[in-house]
Amino acid sequence: MSGMYQDLTGPEILTELTEESIVLLPIGAIEQHGPHLPLSVDYVIADEMARAVLEKCGKEIDLWVLPTLSFSKSNEHSWSPGTISLEYKTLMAVLNDIALSVSNKKKKKI
């Protein structure tokens, strides 16, 4: 079985996800893409790509997609209004915490 991680209940996490499960974390920044595009371009692409991968591969592999992380390291765009950026250490700490939370549920492939 495959699907969206956040659609499972707590008890389902223990029964549906196994050590063979692959958990995908899409990451898309909130940053400028010029005056003609919204700040969410990277987020939308990452979210839709993850859903497409799930649709295409979810019957062949045990794949679970986490909610898309909408913040990343975007300090190169800090000059632009609206950009939200995490420091490298902060982003790595967030990714580590997410991985530990997921792998704590006996899932190893993130």
Predicted regions mapped to residue ranges:
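N-terminal catalytic or cofactor-binding beta/alpha core of small enzyme domains
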Residues: S2-K107
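Acidic/His-rich segments in extracytoplasmic proteins that coordinate ligands and/or metal ions
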Residues: I110
